[in-house]
Amino acid sequence: MSNTNINVQSSTPKKSLGSSQYSLAGSSSSNLNNINNNNNNNNNNNNNSTGQENSIDDSGSSSFVNFPASEWLSKAMHKHPDILELRERTRPITQVKSYSRNKRSSKTEASHSINDTMLLKLIMQYFHEENLTTSLKKIQEETKVQFTPNEVDKDSLENLLRIGIKDTNWFGPLEDIEDADPEVETYHSYISEDSLNENGLEGEGNLIEDRYDESQISRNPDGTIKAATFNRLLLWLIGNFNGPDVNEFKKIFFLTYPSFTTAEAILNKFTQIYQLFDNIESAQVICFIRFWIEQHPTDFNEKLLAILNNFIEHQVAASHAKQLRAVINLKIENYKEARKEIKDPPEPKVPKNIFSPTLTFDDIDEEEIARQLCCIDFALYELIKPSEFLIKGWTKPQYRNKAVNLLNMMRRFNDFTKWIAASILNEQNSKGRSKLLGRFLKISEHLRANNNFHSLMAIYGGINNTHVFRTKAIRKDLSRQQQETYAELEKLFASENSFRNYRIAYKDAKPPCIPFLGIHLRDLAFVDESNPDRINNLLNLNKRRVIWRVIVNTMRYQPIPYYFLKVHQISLFLTELKTESEQPQLTLDLSSHDTVLPSSPSSK
């Protein structure tokens, strides 16, 4: 994998503060001695050089050089490494910004603020977050250091990784940049979605000055917003909250904002507008926040709720505060209880040997297998959040921890597809393979009846796998009904006209329904790559409008679940898929923009 270096612009003029380079991992006594010697040498050099902080002239008096206020803290941290060390070590508690080297993921000025044990625990925290349980267990055995999941360690790990890692999954020190100051150069702020905030929107512009600046907004021929700055967009939305064309745009904004800013930044802007403008706009801010809570209650994690509650407690008028508290209690704390069952589930078809340790795939009824697959798949599908589609976690490894639910569903598809192909090939003879293929085709009929396109495509992909399809002898033993079922699968997932048949079937499906994510992710990748994020330095809102339509279409069936009873033994059997063969499998590619889809038989 090639590494991509991203130039991080300094917020202060580049000014060399010395040449010492301290390693996070190098906390041995010899290294500390070298660090102290380097500091002494640097201090001597600074005192003997012209134009430094101070110098002593022939008369014995001291002269001072005026530095910009933005450099005062940098100078203080350089002169007092003991204070810097304390600052770094208490950062997870104080939440202050971190003083770190530009573009150096493994180096900081506080050389001994992290010891070997802390470093090991951070590595273990990474293994834990990535579900690398085997590696985590092994490192504990080798080092004799026990690991307990800790949210503070998690925050520390994220902060350290964000220092140098942008568009790369390389965890070693990045190469030096010729024009980069080797010393502490800038002040980094790590907000919750720092890696997504590449547009620098949080401090963009002045709300009062931007209020009527038409140069910051561009419109389509029909009058809808085409592009705008962050400030101008928010002001337009609030000023036109009850307008006829704003209802859809509010939905677009709150579903796509993670692609260009953060929830904290939006709430911060709302508080500023509430304080700066008149009562009418203040009331509209409250309406906007209510709309946000009602439509996207899951956006409000503990951190954002704390900010919102502080805003309500100290700045909002009593009447407005009452409205917001009511909607918070109703929507955020009780939203999981809003879904109610509307019908009784069918009686499960349980085999007689359900509790037997020798339970096999052949013992389970095809319809019940399809039902349990629906339960398994929907449990993954309903957890996916809109923001997971926006950060492209399926194509960028460094964002995978932000798209956990989406990736879980993709991995489920990969594992199930591989299991199907390997199960057929593991049969000893052609007759056994044909029989198993027939069972999978029967299951696919029930999946299609229940609109589970996720597992349906996995079955089609598994039996259409190159190695399975080459064994044409297994197809000649299929019944006419089974061959017709296979032909229907081919037709449904044919790639002609951009998977037109699937799109029609998905559009017309009556809920409950589960989409095949591969096609929808391909749509998102196409929209993202073929449209710029900005037009003349304005946010491209036409692009967000198209992205919103794709995401809403993908998530449209989340509110309505399947009402099948879960049979634990069958569900466990279908979840813990085990194969004896490691045949090449069809996958939703987690590392590229293109989704791998089955080929038609005619292309083989």
Curated annotation (Swiss-Prot):
InterPro entries to which the protein is assigned, alphabetical: LisH, Ras-like_GEF, Ras-like_Gua-exchang_fac_N, Ras_GEF_dom_sf, RASGEF_cat_dom, RASGEF_cat_dom_sf
One annotated GO biological process: positive regulation of Ras protein signal transduction
SUPFAM superfamilies: Ras GEF
Protein name: Ras guanine nucleotide exchange factor H
Annotated ranges, domain LisH: 115-147
Function field: Promotes the exchange of Ras-bound GDP by GTP. Component of the Sca1 complex, a regulator of cell motility, chemotaxis and signal relay. The Sca1 complex is recruited to the plasma membrane in a chemoattractant- and F-actin-dependent manner and is enriched at the leading edge of chemotaxing cells where it regulates F-actin dynamics and signal relay by controlling the activation of rasC and the downstream target of rapamycin complex 2 (TORC2)-Akt/protein kinase B (PKB) pathway.
Compartments reported by the entry: Cell membrane
N-terminal Ras-GEF domain segment(s): 221-335
Keyword terms, alphabetized: Cell membrane, Guanine-nucleotide releasing factor, Membrane
Region Disordered: start-end pairs: 1-61
Xref: Pfam families: RasGEF (PF00617), RasGEF_N (PF00618)
Bias type Low complexity, positions: 27-49
Bias (Polar residues): 1-26, 50-61
Known partners and oligomeric status: Component of the Sca1 complex composed of at least gefA, gefH, scaA, phr, and the protein phosphatase 2A subunits pppA and pho2B. Interacts directly with gefA and phr.
Observed phenotype of the null mutant: Display directionality defects during chemotaxis as well as defects in random motility.
Domain Ras-GEF: 365-591
Organism: Dictyostelium discoideum (Social amoeba)
Signal sequence region: none
UniProt-recorded Gene Ontology molecular function terms: guanyl-nucleotide exchange factor activity; protein kinase activator activity
UniProt xrefs under SMART domains: RasGEF, RasGEFN
Protein's gene: gefH
GO cellular component, one term: cytosol
